Amino acid sequence: VCSSDLAAPAVNAHFKLLEPASWVVEDDKGDPQKLAPCGGTYADPGTPTKAVTAVTGGQKLKIVVDETVFHPGHYRIALARKRNHLPADPAVKTHDTEKGPRSLSAEIAKPRPPVIADGLWPHKEKPTAKWETEITVPNITCDGCQLQVIEFMAEHPGVREGGFSYHHCAVLNIKADPAKPAEDARWK
């Protein structure tokens, strides 16, 4: 649900990953969150929470984010066995403004490994509630899997440490459900 607030957008967007638990201690705005693939900054890589969320393959997992500083855009969710296997930030189209180049749009990926969902919660106005969805966890066994949530920011000049996206991750221990079809080979 979005309001019709017509206030000028802030220069920076921020969000907190509320569910599942973030891998890094986040402040009230969600920082540190700039660097891909999972947040941190050059000056502050972040303090690990050591949080691990246990889930069963083939089951639903609730994702909740709180956009603490508004910027128009959308979100993407991805999953990989290791952080270095998470997808790169989306390709971005920019346009010239009187303040210099600004992001206009980002490529939205089709949901196939490692991307679970993209183009989530597209918005041009300040949200009035937390963003929530449920994803189906792949029926795999994976200790230490990395669930990534990124926010693409439109009408943004970009930041040196994160381009046009902010990043959060959660660590999942996934146990395949033997009652469901065999592990999906695309997630190997």
Report residues per predicted region.
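C-terminal segment of classical bacterial N-terminal signal peptides
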Residues: D5-V11
